[in-house]
Amino acid sequence: MARLQEFYKETVAPDLLKQFGYKSVMEVPRITKITLNMGVGEAVGDKKILEHAVGDMVKIAGQKPVVTKARKSIAGFKIRDGYPIGCMVTLRGAKMFEFLDRLVTVAMPRIRDFRGIGGKGFDGRGNYNLGVKEQIIFPEIEYDKIDALRGMNISITTTAKSDQEARALLVAFKFPFKN
C-alpha cells in the first residue's frame, strides 16, 4: 500500500469525518483518479516530438499514455481530423497515490518562484485542475535529455460534492495552497 494511501485511511478520513459531520466513512471524499494531459500541437509537423512527449509521460506517470487525436479539422492550425495532437494517462489506485506523493513532496517544491498553488482550479463539483509549465520539475526527467520544455494539465477527480470539501481533502494531503 502506498504511503499516502495509508495516511488517508489512518489520518485524513477520520479528520474529515469529524470536520464535516458525515454519518458514514463512505461519505468522506476521496481521490478517485488523476489524469495527466499533455497537448503537443507541434506534433502535426514532426512525429518525433510526440514520441518524446510520450516518453516523458511514461517516465512521469509510470505507465504508457494513450495518444489523443484531433476530433475535427481546423485549417487555421493546419490540423486534420484524426491527427495525433497529444497524449494522456489516467492513474488510479496505488500508482495514483505514488504520483500524488511525488507531486506534492518532490515536484512542487522544484517549481521556480513557487509560492503555492492557486485556489481557482476547482470546477464547482469537487475536482481540481492544475497546470504545470515545465515537465522538468519531476525528478524522473533529466534536463540534458529533453528536446523541449512542455507543460501539462493535472486533473484530480474526487468524490467530494463541493469545492469546500475537495479543498479540505487536498489540504489534508498537504497541498501547498497560497492562502
UniProtKB/Swiss-Prot annotation:
| Example of a GO cellular component annotation carried by this entry | ribosome
rRNA-binding listed as a keyword:
yes
- Pfam families linked to this entry: Ribosomal_L5, Ribosomal_L5_C
Which molecular-function annotations from GO does this UniProt entry contain?
rRNA binding; structural constituent of ribosome; tRNA binding
Per UniProt, which keywords does this protein have? Ribonucleoprotein, Ribosomal protein, RNA-binding, rRNA-binding, tRNA-binding
Name the Gene Ontology biological process terms: translation
Record's function text: This is one of the proteins that bind and probably mediate the attachment of the 5S RNA into the large ribosomal subunit, where it forms part of the central protuberance. In the 70S ribosome it contacts protein S13 of the 30S subunit (bridge B1b), connecting the 2 subunits; this bridge is implicated in subunit movement. Contacts the P site tRNA; the 5S rRNA and some of its associated proteins might help stabilize positioning of ribosome-bound tRNAs.
Oligomeric form and interacting partners:
Part of the 50S ribosomal subunit; part of the 5S rRNA/L5/L18/L25 subcomplex. Contacts the 5S rRNA and the P site tRNA. Forms a bridge to the 30S subunit in the 70S ribosome.
Q: Which family does it belong to?
A: Belongs to the universal ribosomal protein uL5 family.
Task: Please identify the protein, giving its name as recorded.
Answer: Large ribosomal subunit protein uL5
Organism, by scientific name, is Aromatoleum aromaticum (strain DSM 19018 / LMG 30748 / EbN1) (Azoarcus sp. (strain EbN1))
- This chain is encoded by the gene named rplE
